[in-house]
């Protein structure tokens, strides 16, 4: 076995980083045999199997490595597992792991969970969390030492395994508790989490068995794995996961939009499709959550229904004068029908409207998102171009709701929320303070933002709870905080409050970066199926959450805030990424404008219909065409038009 280059690499890391990260690339081990669902034995040396590391210093703190295995034996070497291990030394309980899209600081909101619903990792003896390469949106794993301030990350070039025993077998990446530290591990197939070996996070509520993920090396076969080791020191100005995220952007450069439709075409088709959802009758008026062919005619505000979005977006986009009439009617209906449902105790209101006149529901996510659209519509109606709109009823509705929300939040006995769902209330409160001249709205917005900043800004903390169907860390929870911080940042800039500008700029950047780690920065490859049929490019799409492991187009909703942060931070990468996210997520849209929610880039089946989930990677579930998959495109296009920006 050739260990010379491995020894040189350890020295190269020290020279390249100039940092104090206590870690090392361990000598390679080869797994032989398979027993009880895992590698039977690890060996340091297999006669005839040469292992060599080729290294390149990329920049301070970053070394590129290509590990090369060559089998010189005369017969196949069977039931083999190849590996890479980078060990970060320290108390395992103080080493906080961050794997984008699946294990955010070990997913502390589900601490102690033992089933397969949400992966967890705290650093206890025997713990591991290892996942398929194709599952990872940003393909890296980082460990941050909460005591010393060091961090280490391993970035990978995701790849399938030649000679894998399982169909569509890929390499895997994860973390494993060790004596005196935690290992970042790359394996040629084996996966597992929550102390369960050889299982895949393949369903919303449970795991799926994934056994016998070994490989066979043929005589003369050469196999290589490319990875980058990044070491440094985290500070409150740049946590380790943020520095790793920035390197991931630089490595994969997810900015190419040449293959995608232009924004004008996208917005027009989405507008045309939105009109097919229009319903107008004695008890209901607006845009339905589901397609009319389903027979379900509910108008639902916020979250998956987005019933208030077109009231803002259609007049701004101004495709036809009839769009203004529909926008007026849709928001007037909300003002008339739902104003009486506003609860004086907390400002929440009913969000589901049925054709028979009944209304129900109401939660911070849906109410906050709806109020933000209504407030943007009120703002636009006050401009010269929006003079054709009468915002009287909208103003009455929004001011009453925001007054009740701010009253509740500003109470001394206000109950601090368990999740970031109430983060979606911040942006409309900020606009309310400006449009209605209500300082109490701004005070409530700052109180909410201050609470979220105190709870979630720091090592080992991850935003969660912005989604209504997952109880874990999720990108929607991070977006809830990011949207609110960014609104407060703009207000601080407008009012020339330098201290608050600095505070909210950092909070917004942190929440944005955590949200962006759910974003695909590389284009995966797929088995035969719908995604391969369309040469689907995954860059710009986003993983939902550690619990819901499919891609969706939700990132489109975040595009305006990302672009504005790119402008504020003078970071052209963010602007280009925002453009990619908008345009890439139009892929798979039918000629009618319909788009389904679930993109199966990895082993995951959200309906859990008991089919073979490992045969579904590369598939596309197009039946769930709820209105947000249309509304977010229109909302983002409208905001960008108001900003005078072409994506």
Give the residues covered by each predicted segment.
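Short, well-ordered helical secondary-structure segments
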Residues: 2, 86, 123, 130, ...
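Carbohydrate-recognition beta-sandwich/jelly-roll modules
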Residues: 25-370, 374-395, 399-403
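Bacterial N-terminal signal peptides
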Residues: 8-17
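Bacterial N-terminal signal peptides that target proteins for export
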Residues: 1-8
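Boundary at the C-terminal end of the N-terminal hydrophobic targeting segment
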Residues: 20-23
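Glycan-recognition and catalytic cores of secretory/periplasmic carbohydrate-active enzymes
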Residues: 235-647
């Amino acid at each position: 076995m050739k260990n010379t280059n491995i020894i040189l690499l350890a020295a190269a890391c020290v020279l390249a980083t100039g940092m104090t990260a206590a870690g090392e690339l361990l000598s390679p081990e080869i797994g032989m045999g398979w027993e009880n669902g895992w590698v039977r034995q690890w060996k340091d040396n297999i006669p005839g199997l040469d292992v060599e590391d080729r290294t390149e210093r990329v920049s301070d703190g970053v070394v590129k490595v290509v590990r090369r295995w060559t089998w010189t034996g005369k017969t196949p070497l069977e039931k083999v597992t190849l590996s890479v291990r980078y060990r970060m030394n320290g108390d395992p309980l103080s080493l906080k792991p961050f794997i984008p899209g699946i294990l955010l600081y070990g997913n502390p909101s589900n601490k102690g969970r033992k089933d397969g619903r949400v992966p967890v990792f705290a650093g206890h003896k025997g713990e591991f969390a290892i996942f398929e390469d194709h599952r990872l949106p940003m393909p890296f794993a980082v460990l941050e030492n909460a005591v010393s301030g060091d961090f280490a990350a391993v970035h990978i070039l995701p790849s399938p395994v030649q000679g894998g025993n399982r169909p569509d077998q890929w390499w895997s990446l994860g973390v494993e508790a060790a004596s005196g530290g935690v290992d970042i591990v790359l394996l040629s197939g084996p996966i597992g989490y929550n102390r369960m070996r050889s299982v895949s996070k393949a369903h919303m509520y449970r795991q799926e068995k994934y056994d016998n993920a070994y490989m066979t090396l043929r005589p003369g076969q050469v196999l290589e794995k490319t990875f980058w080791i990044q070491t440094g020191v985290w500070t409150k100005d740049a946590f380790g996961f943020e520095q790793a995220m920035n390197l991931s952007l630089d490595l994969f450069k997810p900015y190419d939009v040449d293959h995608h439709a232009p924004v004008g075409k996208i917005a027009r088709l989405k507008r045309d499709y939105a009109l097919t959802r229009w319903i107008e009758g004695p008890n209901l008026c607006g845009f339905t959550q589901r397609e009319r062919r389903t027979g379900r005619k509910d108008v639902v505000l916020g979250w998956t229904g987005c019933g208030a979005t077109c009231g803002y977006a259609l007049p701004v986009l101004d495709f036809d004068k009839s769009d203004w009439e529909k926008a007026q009617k849709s928001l007037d209906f909300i003002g008339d029908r739902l104003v009486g449902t506003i609860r004086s105790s907390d400002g929440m209101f009913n969000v589901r409207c049925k054709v028979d006149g009944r209304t129900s529901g109401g939660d911070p996510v849906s109410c906050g998102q709806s109020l933000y659209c209504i407030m943007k519509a009120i703002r636009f109606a006050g401009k010269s171009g929006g003079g054709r709109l009468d915002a009287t009823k909208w103003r009455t509705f929004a001011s009453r709701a925001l007054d009740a929300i701010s009253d509740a939040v500003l109470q001394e006995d206000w109950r601090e929320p368990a999740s970031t769902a109430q983060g979606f209330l911040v942006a409309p409160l900020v606009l309310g303070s400006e449009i209605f001249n209500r300082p109490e709205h701004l005070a409530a917005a700052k109180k909410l933002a201050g609470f979220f900043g105190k709870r979630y800004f720091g090592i080992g903390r991850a935003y969660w709870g912005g989604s209504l169907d997952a109880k874990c860390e999720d990108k929607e929870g991070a977006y809830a905080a990011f949207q609110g911080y960014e609104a407060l940042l703009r207000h601080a800039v407008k009012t020339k409050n330098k201290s608050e500008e600095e505070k909210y700029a950092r909070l917004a950047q942190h929440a944005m970066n955590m949200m962006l780690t759910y974003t695909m920065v590389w284009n995966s490859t797929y088995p035969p199926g719908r995604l391969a049929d369309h040469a689907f490019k995954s860059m710009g799409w986003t993983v939902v959450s550690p619990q819901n492991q499919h891609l969706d187009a939700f990132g489109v909703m975040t595009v305006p805030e990302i672009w504005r942060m790119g402008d504020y931070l003078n970071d052209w990468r963010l602007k280009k990424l925002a453009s990619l996210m908008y345009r890439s997520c139009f892929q798979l849209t039918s000629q009618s404008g319909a788009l389904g929610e679930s993109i199966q880039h990895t082993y995951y089946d959200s309906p859990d219909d008991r089919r073979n989930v490992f045969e579904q990677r590369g598939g596309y579930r197009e039946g769930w065409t709820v209105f947000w998959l249309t509304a977010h495109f229109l909302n983002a296009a409208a905001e960008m038009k108001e900003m005078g920006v072409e994506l």
